[in-house]
């Protein structure tokens, strides 16, 4: 990969001394509200969301190479990162329009790459829903949108992390067997599209190419892929892009995510780290809502630390430096 000196220095800040990105993701907004709402009757407040993000930043960034936050509720937390941790800021609005299958991208209207950089970001992250087999007119809109963000990041000389969430316009349940069958094609082909230089992307944040719950030996439901088939998809994923790529945890358990990383490595995926969110911190939400700040801190110092420490050990054994791509 070719990086300007400025972008390279930001990438160094976001990764550890071995060039591995062990980033903590807490840019959840809608998903966080829904999690909190499970444990209280009233609507979660802005103050609650901001405070929990601060707690997670204070307690867990000493063990992460960087943290991803949103500029809506995450700016207080951005001031509480460990001194060695880098900062990624999300540029997209949360969620998507559920009345349509288009899932068009949308920036936070009062933000720009320039403003995110001024706020202290070491990288701009943008989430895109993409169906490679979807409406061509819609996909051209999405590609043009990403080109614009790439140009912004190039102008500001700041790394651009594109998070791709693949989907199928005709399948409503992403957890279904039906979608599991087409997921490898959806994930891999979307990666190929956005590896084109014209998008100006520096790192791809991607899903693993299969739903591990339907892989032989990993789940207790129906089997969609044998382990050999799944391994082949991981190998294909590594060949799908010349760019550094990191895995998102997609809300799965810490254990399944760690097992998946080991499987990925054994299959020949030379991934460059993770942006791991709920698998690390989700358990703190219940304690925070029901018992308060001290209980949430205690959970983060014990269970949260255990999650991130185990993940770091797995990463050390499985991930490779982004400098090698």
Swiss-Prot record:
Name of the gene encoding the protein in the UniProt record: lacD1
Reaction catalyzed: D-tagatofuranose 1,6-bisphosphate = D-glyceraldehyde 3-phosphate + dihydroxyacetone phosphate
Family stated for the protein in its record: Belongs to the aldolase LacD family.
Pathway annotation from the record: Carbohydrate metabolism; D-tagatose 6-phosphate degradation; D-glyceraldehyde 3-phosphate and glycerone phosphate from D-tagatose 6-phosphate: step 2/2
EC code: 4.1.2.40
Keywords, in A-Z order: Lactose metabolism, Lyase
InterPro entries: Aldolase_TIM (IPR013785), DeoC/FbaB/LacD_aldolase (IPR002915), LacD_aldolase (IPR050552), Tag_1.6-dipho_adolase (IPR005927)
Protein name: Tagatose 1,6-diphosphate aldolase 1
Keyword Lyase: yes
Coiled coil recorded as keyword: no
Gene3D superfamilies membership: Aldolase class I
Name of a matching Pfam family: DeoC
PANTHER family to which the protein is assigned, alphabetical: SULFOFRUCTOSEPHOSPHATE ALDOLASE
GO terms (BP aspect): 6-sulfoquinovose(1-) catabolic process; D-tagatose 6-phosphate catabolic process; lactose catabolic process via tagatose-6-phosphate
Class of this enzyme: lyase
NCBIfam families linked: lacD (TIGR01232), PRK04161.1 (NF003180), PRK12399.1 (NF009065), PRK12858.1 (NF009498)
SMART domains associated with the record: DeoC
Organism ancestry: Bacteria, Bacillati, Bacillota, Bacilli, Lactobacillales
Molecular function terms, GO-annotated: 6-deoxy-6-sulfofructose-1-phosphate aldolase activity; tagatose-6-phosphate kinase activity; tagatose-bisphosphate aldolase activity
């Amino acid at each position: 990969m070719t990086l300007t000196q400025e972008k390279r220095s930001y990438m160094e800040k976001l990764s550890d001394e071995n060039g591995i990105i062990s980033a903590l993701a807490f840019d959840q907004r809608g998903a966080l509200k829904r999690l909190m709402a499970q444990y209280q009757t009233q609507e979660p407040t802005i103050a609650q969301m901001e405070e929990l993000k601060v707690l997670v930043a204070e307690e867990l960034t000493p063990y992460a190479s960087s943290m991803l936050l949103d500029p809506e509720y995450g700016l207080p937390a951005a001031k509480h990162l460990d001194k060695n941790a880098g900062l990624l800021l999300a540029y997209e609005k949360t969620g998507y329009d559920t009345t349509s299958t288009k899932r068009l991208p949308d920036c936070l209207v009062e933000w720009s790459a320039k403003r995110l950089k001024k706020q202290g970001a070491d990288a701009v992250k943008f989430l895109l829903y993409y169906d490679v087999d979807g409406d061509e007119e819609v996909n051209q809109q999405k590609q043009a949108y990403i080109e614009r963000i790439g140009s912004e990041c190039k102008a500001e000389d700041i790394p651009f992390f594109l998070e791709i969430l693949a989907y199928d316009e005709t399948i409503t349940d992403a957890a279904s067997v039906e979608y599991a069958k087409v997921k490898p094609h959806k994930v891999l082909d979307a990666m190929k599209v956005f590896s084109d230089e014209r998008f100006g992307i520096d790192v791809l944040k991607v899903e693993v190419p299969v739903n591990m719950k339907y892989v032989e030996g990993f789940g207790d439901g129906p089997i969609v892929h044998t382990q050999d088939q799944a391994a082949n998809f991981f190998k294909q994923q590594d060949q799908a892009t010349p760019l550094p790529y990191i895995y998102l945890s997609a809300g799965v358990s810490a254990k399944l995510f760690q097992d998946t990383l080991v499987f990925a490595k054994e299959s020949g995926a030379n991934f460059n780290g993770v942006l791991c969110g709920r698998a690390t911190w989700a358990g703190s939400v219940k304690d925070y809502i029901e018992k308060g700040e001290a209980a949430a801190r205690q959970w983060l110092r014990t269970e949260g630390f255990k999650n991130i420490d185990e993940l770091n050990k797995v990463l050390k054994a499985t991930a490779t430096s982004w400098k090698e791509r």
